[in-house]
Amino acid sequence: MKKLKSYVLLVLAVLFLTACVTDQERPTNVKYIEKTDRTWQQHFTQLKQIQGYPALGQLGYISSKERFSTRFDWQYNNPRDYTLQLYSTISSETLQIQMHAQGMTISDNKGRQRSAADAKMLLREIIGMDFPLEQFAFWLKGQPEDNADYQVGENHLLATFSRTIDGKPWTADYLSYHVNRRPPMPENILLKTEGQTLKIRVDEWLF
């Protein structure tokens, strides 16, 4: 386990060399419309019908202790079957986070891996950060959860939401969308919680 954890830190150090995370502040003066807007409700229904999906993009992470950026490959099937692969465009290093029926497995391209039934514990132990991957599938496609406090923008798409998970308040701002595809899907997302910022750019929605 120590070898894998050390290797994860090395991978993040490599990814750090390509880090370029900007626009960390939440947008202001955003105009909202009613959640009962017909166009939004139709879009919301479409999002709920998207059960499994793949997406490719980039993410940048900033905390008081570290920062890094990386490419990602997200393959989602259901809450117990998804894979998040992190990799750099300037090296061969990769890190894979896989959810399965028995729990979670984190592995690298050198064959080292660690598994645990408690996914949150494993992420905290190996990656060193708390991130609600179980909610990520909804957040990435711009679908607010039923218990989230959200706002709809003038573009009739999700603009922002706030959600408390394990006592931590999370906010998400949807900065831009791929509007030339149907349905429109998020392009740039800014996630924040106490001392952590995650900026996501989805380059391709593969469905």
From Swiss-Prot:
Residues making up the signal peptide according to the UniProt record: 1-19
* InterPro entries attached to this UniProt entry: LolA/LolB/LppX (IPR029046), OM_lipoprot_LolB (IPR004565)
- Give the UniProt keywords, A-Z: Cell outer membrane, Chaperone, Lipoprotein, Membrane, Palmitate, Protein transport, Signal, Transport
Output the Gene Ontology cellular-component terms. cell outer membrane
S-diacylglycerol cysteine lipidation: where?
C20
What the entry lists under CDD domains is as follows: LolB
Residue numbers with lipid attached (N-palmitoyl cysteine):
C20
Query: Single Gene Ontology BP term?
Result: lipoprotein localization to outer membrane
Give the highest taxon in the source lineage. Bacteria
Instruction: Describe its membrane topology.
Output: Lipid-anchor
Question: Where is it mostly found?
Answer: membrane
Q: Which family does it belong to?
A: Belongs to the LolB family.
NCBIfam families on file: lolB
| Matches recorded under HAMAP family | LolB
Q: What is this protein called?
A: Outer-membrane lipoprotein LolB
Organism for this UniProt entry: Aggregatibacter actinomycetemcomitans
